[in-house]
C-alpha cells in the first residue's frame, strides 16, 4: 500500500531536524452542507534543516521516528519570499487608493 503524501505550510522550525507543517483541507459540514476549512498540524522530520517558516512542503508518512513524528519532508515545493508578499501588499494598497480617489467608495 502506498504511503500517504500531504502538502502544507511550515509554521515552526525551532526544533532540530523537525518542522511543524500545517495542512488545510475542506470538509463538508454535516448539518449545513457548507464546506469549511480544517487545519491539522503534523511534526515532520527535516534531515538537513532546510525548511524555513512559510515554505510550502510535501510530507510523506513514515515509521515512528519519535513520540510525535510520523512524517518526513519529501521536498520543498516553494520557498517563502517575503519580498514578493510585500510587493503584492503594495499593489493592493495602490489599487485601494486609486478606487478611493475616483470616488468609488462613499463614506
Curated annotation (Swiss-Prot):
Specify the domain of life of the species encoding this protein. Bacteria
Which CDD domains does this chain map to?
Ribosomal_uS17
Matches recorded under SUPFAM superfamilies: Nucleic acid-binding proteins
Pfam families membership: Ribosomal_S17
A GO molecular-function term, please? Answer: structural constituent of ribosome
Record GO cellular component, one term: cytosolic small ribosomal subunit
GO BP terms: namely: translation
Which InterPro entries would you find in this protein's record?
NA-bd_OB-fold, Ribosomal_uS17, Ribosomal_uS17_bact/chlr, Ribosomal_uS17_CS
User: Which keywords belong to this entry?
Assistant: Ribonucleoprotein, Ribosomal protein, RNA-binding, rRNA-binding
| Oligomer and partners | Part of the 30S ribosomal subunit.
Q: Which family does it belong to?
A: Belongs to the universal ribosomal protein uS17 family.
The record describes the protein's role as:
One of the primary rRNA binding proteins, it binds specifically to the 5'-end of 16S ribosomal RNA.
Q: What is this protein called?
A: Small ribosomal subunit protein uS17
Amino acid at each position: 500500500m502506498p504511503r500517504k503524501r500531504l502538502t502544507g505550510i511550515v509554521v515552526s522550525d525551532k526544533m532540530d531536524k523537525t518542522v511543524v507543517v500545517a495542512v488545510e483541507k475542506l470538509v463538508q459540514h454535516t448539518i449545513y452542507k457548507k464546506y469549511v476549512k480544517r487545519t491539522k498540524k503534523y511534526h515532520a522530520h527535516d534531515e538537513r534543516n532546510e525548511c524555513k517558516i512559510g515554505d510550502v512542503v510535501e510530507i510523506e508518512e513514515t515509521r515512528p521516528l519519535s513520540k510525535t513524528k510520523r512524517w518526513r519532508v519529501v521536498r520543498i515545493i516553494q520557498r517563502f519570499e517575503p519580498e514578493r508578499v510585500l510587493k503584492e501588499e503594495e499593489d493592493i494598497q495602490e489599487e485601494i487608493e486609486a478606487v478611493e480617489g475616483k470616488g468609488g467608495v462613499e463614506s
